[in-house]
Amino acid sequence: MSAKAEYLQQEDFLHRSNKLQEISDLGINPYPYEFPGTSSVEEIKNEFSSQSLGNSEDATNKNTPKVKISGRMVLFRSMGKNAFAQILDNDQKIQVMFNRDFSSVAGLPEDAEITPIKFIEKKLDLGDILGIEGYLFFTHSGELTILVETVTLLGKALISLPDKHAGLSDKETRYRKRWLDLICSDEVRQTFLKRSRIIKLIRQYMDAQDFIEVETPILQNIYGGAEATPFVTTLNALHSDMFLRISLEIALKKILVGGTPRVYEIGKVFRNEGIDRTHNPEFTMIEAYAMNIDYHSVMVYVENLIEYLVGELNNGSTVLTYSHLKQGPQTIDFKAPWIRMTMKDSIKTYGGVDVDLHGDHELRNILKERSSLPEESYATAPRGLLIAALFDELVCDKLIAPHHITDHPLETTPLCKSLRSGEEDYVERFESFCLGKELCNAYSELTDPMRQRMLLEKQMEKKALDPDSEYHPIDEEFLEALCQGMPPAGGFGIGIDRLVMILTDSASIRDVLYFPVMRRLESEND
């Protein structure tokens, strides 16, 4: 039997399956259709935690507020005529008390040989999903509790929960079986609730800045907007290859040409490349473009957006504390303005190398001595890519506080305007960094269609000389759109998964993705 079905033969599964049959034999549907009219545990706590409700006797006399909830039973203990359980609803837990003389089981026949309290003790298990109707009271220790009048089985769990003390210690199991991770870990639930809130807050911020949210195709005839290897698929209806997008950029610029002054998209992007602590082949991005601004204005947008997010998540404070850094615990202030530094200056400041004092051969020697890059990766690289490699190797990890690194070499992108100072070897591009991670990429967008064509053709010629490079056709539709006339514009892209990592102090991108890409198990090939 394959690994994915091993649980079917486990003793606990068989034992719970027998209980399931016994419950069904009593005429109780263990998987009912609905349980309407519930309140959330959070709502109940917010409304009643500060009220004077009375004790268990008041609840028994039905003199306290009646409530109705549903959730998963995660703790249970029996104490004579009473039994206590903890019910997990979303990210909140509440204690419930079953009483031998007061509590009933929905659907249990009056003439059943088993009493309600014995049914609760013998037929229900940790992990079962229960509907609870009852009366609120405070225990002697002051804990808000529901005295259960009626319990309804909403979903019988046939597989045990992990041990409550050990939890899920194996990371791979956590990532593959995220549902268990969510059940067992308050911290994990909070991380994903925070992720959802971050995306909601981003939309609120962008909408308040008069950006229009749009949707553009994931399947594309030609991929572009970034240097990355695409996923390729076949569209059977047209008998043609299609690509999963590697960027949102090109389609959004076409919309800008069409007259929409400010546009953004939050969506999935796919790159058929490596998997590591900060990269997943499928990831979520926001890209945004606005007419009549340059990369200086975009820097302000980006740092104000991040400052806003931190403040909303942190009760108004712009300061976050991090525990997962190899440098040890750090406190970071995200208040704008952030540190601004050119790429060349950052290499001089953090790497101790003034690239203007060194020729290409010397830069290669520095990379050989001070980086872990294979020599063949930069042996024939042009000067701009040597400078970019020095930055990656000598600087990135040292950018703990928020930085904007500006004025990148031309060779790093064909989609950006050159410096207005006239230095055509450098472009008005910045990347934002924090905690040693790239957070944002942004440009003063190139709007000259003839220069854009020249740069794309030059890029294609270089790729043609590299046997390891894939053929990357020029997007003629994009160039035609630019020929229609594109206004001055600034744009940025932020990887939302990496942003969530930073805002939740998560050590790996897998910790902020519900279901990260994982290696296929051998059993899945059976």
From Swiss-Prot:
GO terms for biological process: lysyl-tRNA aminoacylation. Keywords: Aminoacyl-tRNA synthetase, ATP-binding, Cytoplasm, Ligase, Magnesium, Metal-binding, Nucleotide-binding, Protein biosynthesis. CDD domains: LysRS_N. It is found in: Cytoplasm. Binds 3 Mg(2+) ions per subunit. InterPro entries: Aa-tRNA-synt_II, aa-tRNA-synth_II, aa-tRNA-synth_II/BPL/LPL, Lys-tRNA-ligase_II, Lys-tRNA-ligase_II_N, Lys-tRNA-synth_II_C, NA-bd_OB-fold, NA-bd_OB_tRNA. Its cofactor is Mg(2+). It holds the Pfam family tRNA_anti-codon. Belongs to the class-II aminoacyl-tRNA synthetase family. This is Lysine--tRNA ligase. It comes from Chlamydia felis (strain Fe/C-56) (Chlamydophila felis).
